[in-house]
Structures are given as C-alpha cells and as structure tokens.
Amino acid sequence: PLLASNGLLYGVSESSYENGSVLGSEKLFSYNPVTGVFNTLYDFNLSTGTVQSKLMQATNRKIYMTSADGGFYKRGSIMTYDLTTNALATIYVSRGYNNPDPGPNDFERAANNPLIQASNGKIYLASKFGGNGNLGVTSMLNPDGSSYQINDSFESLLVNQGTVPAGGLLQIGEFLYGTTLNGDDVNF
C-alpha cells in the first residue's frame, strides 16, 4: 500500500475468483489507520484494465498507477486518482508494440513496474514490453499526461544492453537506474 500525504493508506485489491469465475473486479481502496475504516474508491473495469502496479503519489498530490491492458488499444494506460476530487482519470493510453496506427511503439502491458517522479518533475516508467523489438522501453511524460517520450527502446542486437526492464527505476543524483531480466556479463 501507499501512505499518502493525507495520512490514508491506498491500495488495489486483486480480483476475486471462485471455481474459475470472477466474483469481483479489482478495486482502488483507502484505509484510515486511525479509525480502521476501509473505503472502496473505484471499481476497475474493461476500459481501465488490470492494475497491478505499485501506486505512486506525485508532488501534485495525485496517485499514479499503470494498467496492463487498459485504454483504447488494450495495451496499457497510465491513470491518476485525484485526492481532492476523488476522480480517476486516464492520462495516457499506450499504443503498444507493432500497432498499425502511426505513432511510437511505446510501452505495452506495464503490469507491475512502478512509476517514479524524478527531481525534474517528470513521471518515468520502465516497461517489460514495448519498443522497437518489444523487449521493453523506458519513457517519461509530464504529470498531466502530456509530452510522452520514449527514452530508450531495448533491443537484443545492441551490445552491452539488457532487455525486459523489471523492478522500476531509482533516482540517485541526476541519473535513473534500473535492472533488466535479460543481459550479458556486463549488464546482468
């Protein structure tokens, strides 16, 4: 869970199943550790997609999350939950890998890599899939969802570069660091 600036814990519950049938969808919830009260804030659906990412609160006090299969193309999206208005909004929809529509081969199915807000105010994402070879990308955008840009597209033909970013990004000083699932003896 995420401890937000308002003192509440926020999280996403998993879908519930019984005998192979879905009983309930994932839910965004809050928990007040003082009163012990749980509140369901949003029921995710087919248009929002499956949220498996960790939640992140940015300096604008909004909570950010990624979906694995939401948005128009069902390739993933970035969403925010506004603590002031209690509204969920999709701020970016991924086109995914090898999409026939013109545009970048951006992130795809960013299931559980967390977002990070860097010291420059931008939101960064490392996705296991997407990019030119569908081996992952790192990308950034403004907190309002504008100016999406791919920073790096991981490709297996490049020497000394891993593929399939996993675990998110970490900022130390001016640089962002991350890990990949595949690499060589230099990048492992």
Where are these regions (language model features)?
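Extracellular beta-propeller repeat domains
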Residues: 1-188
